Every structure is written in C-alpha cells, then in structure tokens.
C-alpha cells in the first residue's frame, strides 16, 4: 500500500521498513533490521537530574498551565512503582544505587512478572504518558492501548482479560465510575468480568 501513496509524498526523503515476515522489502525502502545491525551504539550522554520537562494541563481549574517536572524526580517516582509492587528497591536518589535495579528487572523478566499496563487515558495526558508509558517502559514492561477513541468500559475490561494486563492507568472518577458501573452491571447479570 505504501507503493500506492509514495509518489504523493515527495517530501519524504527516506523510507524505513520494519519487516514483519509477511511482505518483501519495498524497493525504495531501507530495512530497519539492516540499519540496526550496521549501526553502533551512541556514546552515553550524562544528563543533569535537574533538567526540566514541562507539560501543559488544564488541572482542576480548566485553565491551561505548564507543570514542570525534573528528570531526577521522575526516576525516583518510576522506581517507586517497583517498590509498590513489593520489590526491594534501593534509594535511587543516590545515583550509585541505580545499577542495583538492573538485576531486579532481569529477575522480573525471568519470572514473567514484568508489567503489562493498559493505558485507558490519553497518552497526551501526564498520567497516561508518565505512569502508563514511561514508568512501564523504564521497568522493561509493555503498554497496551485500545483501538478505539473514547471511553468504552466494556472494551477496556475485555482488553484487560485478552491482553493479560497486570495494571490499568486511569484518570479519576471520569474513568473510575463508568468502569465500576460496568463491573457492577456484569456482576448483577451473573456474568462478572474475569479479570
């Protein structure tokens, strides 16, 4: 299908194809696997933990504003997620301890206990981006999304079961109440969700 539209996209200078074993490499594309194989790792860039990320939010007032977070505070909160799951986590505010996290994540992988997080809220929302995406990925886990725009509690609960999600990220009552209503409705019909 890319061949059909490529001529209509003259500003695209480089095409990279990720092989999925089903289609041959398009003649004008580069193989992603070849690029990765031929590339070498970039040197590690040390970042200052006080570097700031700003996201925009309406918050509780509905008025847009910027909220600033430091990278260091994110590292602490991300690994706090491991502690909440019952793992013994070193104090990561001491940079020397961060390397101690690697064996924890390797053990989680070995025991098939890495997080599988269903992100129910938008990824553009701080909760979806940070708690759902960044935290899960930084701990070696997988994120799960649904292929439909909008909040559909039945779809979410079915996705939890079919994708074997271990957690779901939501934002407040706007998500919790409809999901709880669906759980209650299913239970009242003697057909509770098996999650």
Protein language model regions, located:
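Adenylate-forming
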Residues: 1-5, 20-23, 121, 165-195
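Active-site segment of SDR-like NAD(P)-dependent oxidoreductases
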Residues: 58-61, 124
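Short beta->alpha linker loops
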Residues: 49, 73, 151, 171-174
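Conserved AMP-binding/adenylation subdomain of ANL enzymes
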Residues: 77-119, 124-169, 181-182, 186
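A short helix->loop->beta-strand "cap" motif at the edges of active sites that frequently abuts
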Residues: 9-15, 141, 192-195
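Short aromatic/basic micro-patch
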Residues: 29-30, 68, 169
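ANL superfamily adenylate-forming
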Residues: 2-51, 63, 72-75, 181-186
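Conserved pre-ATP/AMP-binding loop-to-beta segment of ANL
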Residues: 38-56, 63, 89, 107-117
